[in-house]
Structures are given as structure tokens and as C-alpha cells.
Amino acid sequence: MNDARAESREHYVDADTPSAARMYDYLLGGHYNYPCDREACDQLLLTAPSTRELALNNRAFLERVVRHIARRYGIRQFLDHGSGLPTQNNVHQVAQSVDPASKVVYIDNDPLVLGYGRAFLEENRNVLILPSDMRETAAIAADAARIIDFSRPVAALFVSVLHCVPDDDRGNPRRMVEDTVRLLAPGSVVVICQLVSEDARIRDAVTELMREQTGNRWGRVRTEAEVAELFTVPRLRIEEEVGLLDVTDWRPDTDLVRRQATQEWIEFGGLATVD
């Protein structure tokens, strides 16, 4: 009975309450969203007009960082926390363009993400999607071990997701990063970035709006210093060549970058290796 209830919750899509995953999909120009998500984005754009450019830049960063990890560090195993809806150049596509044997575990608990993700990935044996709350690190590791060998280097991605996590006893961002790093072998990497603003009015306004729109399924906009503090978790060593910065400027390559006309908030973070 409990399994049946869990499965029912997993497949139930609330089309009347915006979800962060569907809002992000809309900002990227996707089609996996509902009127409520589009209306919520319209409200968000009134407060932070550069949000669409921010979302596009963040997606380009995700592609760059996965490609960099695969080429420079030779890592072939990826954990993508809060993976979101499938779009172009997903993590497994970028990683497998470097090495087709690369393995990717997507972690999300949005029912629409799970539905479309499974349909999209059912033919790829090196990809697994887990219907998990990303704060449940131990359970995720146990399930991910079906295709991930934790005795070898893994890339743990927390890209544009920790702002969805509240600062509570169940699993605040630092605890999530700490718990994940404990699982990782030396030579692994961790990527962290989240939405930040140095303007307290923007932080408060966007946080309040997103909590209201998503039915309180949101954490908060943080400061650059708070994100930098996540990189002080034991065993993490920031990649010194680049450091922490607006991810639009993280190792820019031939990808076209559409600059934010205004910068009410940015996506801030970087990459760290695991000692």
C-alpha cells in the first residue's frame, strides 16, 4: 500500500502550481510547461528582467563544465542533482560525446521530469534517472551504485539547484555537499553554482515570489559569500585557474554568450576537486 501511494505521488503532476523545473524549461524555450509556469515566469521577469538570459547562460555553463570534466579530468561518471526537464545537450549527451561509455545518474523528484526523462532515456543503458529527493544522499548513493562505481572518480553536479533547498534540519545545502563529498573517491570533482544577488531587496523579493508561486517548494537566493562557504567543505579544493565567479565567465569557449542586460542576480559558483 505504501509503495502504491509513493508511486501515485511520483506520477501526479500538479498543473495548477508552478514548479521550478517547468519554469526553467520555459525560460530556456522548452515546451514542458503549463500556463501557471509561464505566468509565474512573467511575474519573475518583472522583478528580475535578465532572468531569461541568466537561464540560457547557466545552461551553456553546464555544457562547458561537463565537457571540461570529461576531457581534462578523464571522469566518466556523473551525478546530476536536480537534473530538470530534458532539453538539448543534456549531461549524458555531452559526456557521451567525449566517451560513449560515460555513465550519468539524473536525480529529481518532479513528476514531469521523471515521466519525460524515463521516456527520453529508456534506450540508454548508461543512464539512470532516480525519483529521489536530492537531500537523501545515502539512498541516492545506494541506488546510483547500480551503474556508478564510487571507488572511482565521480563528478557530482549541483548546478542551479541549491537555491531550491531551504536552510533547515532536513538537509541544508552545506550538509548535502558534505554528505556527497564523503562518498566520493579522490580525484572526483564537485560543481556548485546557484542564484545569488548582492542586493538584499532582490534576494528578498525573488525568494518571497518563488516561495509563494511554488507552494513553498523553494529555498532562497543567497549571496556570493554564502556560495563560497560551500567550497570550504573538507577535501574540496577550488580549481585555482578560474576560481569562483559568474558562471557566464567560467572558461568561455566558442559558445555564444548572451549577456544579461541587467544583473539583478547571477549564477555564481565554480568547480572543486576532491582530495
Where are the language model's segments positioned?
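Rossmann-like AdoMet
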Residues: 1-132, 137-138, 145-150
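Conserved S-adenosyl-L-methionine
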Residues: 24, 235-254
